[in-house]
């Protein structure tokens, strides 16, 4: 029970940290939309839009990779930081764009992916989590729908998860979305290579916060925590070996105490006699 309680505390703290991180990203998206996009004409006041996006980026650049505005046809209208767009990326086929257009009332968060929209001249590849939403763009006397993209640096989430995956006892924590797509997993490389599997779809859909399961004949206890707004799940996997090993340690400790008591009794009896 101590193992479960300790892991529950770790999960609660981590859920709070991830939620705070995502709230900050939503606030960036809200500020970009309500304070910049809705206050300026996308064509006549493009400089003001760039300035507003730049201020937001500079204030949050430790956690951001880019902020971009696209029209409904996928054409880039504005972006920060100012870098070259890669040659004709068809954003209309990308998941973050389609999600925003399909469900227009929410901000959507993608699973991690390599950003392939902009070229900053370093020839580096950046892993990001994209948040996207439909926005209303003002163009003179007309309005049109577009998509606001905020790319978060994936390393922020990755560092949070790495900090709690240090026990070395066989247990681990992973993060998935509401459909079971993995966002972070300490064994991701083995899963990608087909050497490991994970029951993330079950964890994502489970209504129970803690349950037992068998995965490839391995008995495990699974604990699930929900990340507000996103539908993400933080999952703790505890192999039953850690519970049996704990019991074995307790038994060894009790036997050691009994042995010491027996030795003390023998010693006392000899002293008396």
Predicted segment positions?
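Short loop/turn segments at beta-alpha junctions that line or gate ligand-sensing/allosteric surfaces
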Residues: 90, 110-121, 187, 192-193, ...
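Soluble sensory domains of the PAS superfamily and closely related sensory modules
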Residues: 95-107, 197-214
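Solvent-exposed, extracytoplasmic
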Residues: 50-58, 83, 147-190
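Cytoplasm-proximal transmembrane signaling helix
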Residues: 233-273
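Extracytoplasmic/periplasmic ligand-binding sensor regions of membrane-associated signaling proteins
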Residues: 58-63, 73-152
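Amphipathic coiled-coil signal-relay and dimerization helices
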Residues: 70-82, 180-186, 223-225
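Extracytoplasmic
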Residues: 119-148, 159, 166-169, 215-231, ...
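Juxtamembrane extracytoplasmic/periplasmic/luminal helical "stalk" adjacent to the first N-terminal
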Residues: 1-42
